[in-house]
A protein has these predicted regions:
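Short S/T/G/P-rich N-terminal loop/turn motif that feeds into the first structured element of a domain
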Residues: 1-187
Length: 187
């Protein structure tokens, strides 16, 4: 969105460990073809290795519990930066997530939706964790957010008691490459 905190959007690469990520980045920045690619596309994106964030990501629910995401890999995302309230921790967040899943179980809605938590290492001033919502579209996100405000009840109260979440980063998103589906790739 126009109000994004990040000049370059949100680019996400997922690795099985920080060591694997660091090794891949070191290889990438030394590769001549990669350097040429970055130079050719710097009007689209700039890869700032020094600003890379380290987050552990986890889905806390079956990602297809509301149906599959669109076949073309596109979706709409909301990334909420959240800070724990005084005396609260990841254990409290897990309790809130359990209530959130119960609330989701009671919804009668159609359309793809998934969410996940990006847990930090405590070094990010903006967030202890990021709550990521992955919707089929911006329209379905608006409906979901309205449902949350109107009927979130105990789950909403628990989450708000656990953490303060700021306004979200909003993106029209897409999968470029998924190693679980190697034949699927954006060109």
């Amino acid at each position: 969105s126009e109000e994004s905190r990040f000049d370059n959007g949100w680019w996400e690469l997922q690795w099985s460990s920080k060591e694997d990520a660091d090794a891949a980045w070191a290889e990438w920045i030394q590769d001549e073809e990669a350097s040429a690619f970055m130079a050719d596309h710097e009007s689209v994106m700039v890869c700032d290795g020094d600003a890379r964030g380290v987050w552990d990501f986890a889905f806390h629910r079956d990602v297809e519990s509301f149906g599959p995401m669109p076949e073309d890999g596109s979706f709409f995302t909301e990334f909420f930066p959240c800070k724990y309230n005084d005396g609260k921790s990841s254990a409290d967040l897990i309790e809130s997530i359990a209530l959130y899943n119960e609330w989701l179980d009671g919804l009668d809605v159609a359309g793809a939706y998934a969410y996940g938590i990006y847990s930090g290492d405590g070094s990010d001033e903006l967030a202890d964790f990021w709550w990521g919502n992955f919707h089929e579209s911006s329209e379905s996100a608006a409906v979901g957010n309205e449902n949350w405000i109107e009927s979130g009840g105990q789950a909403r109260a628990s989450l708000e008691a656990t953490a303060a979440c700021d306004v979200p980063e909003l993106y029209n998103s897409g999968v470029i490459y998924d190693p679980a589906r190697p034949a699927f790739a954006k060109s």
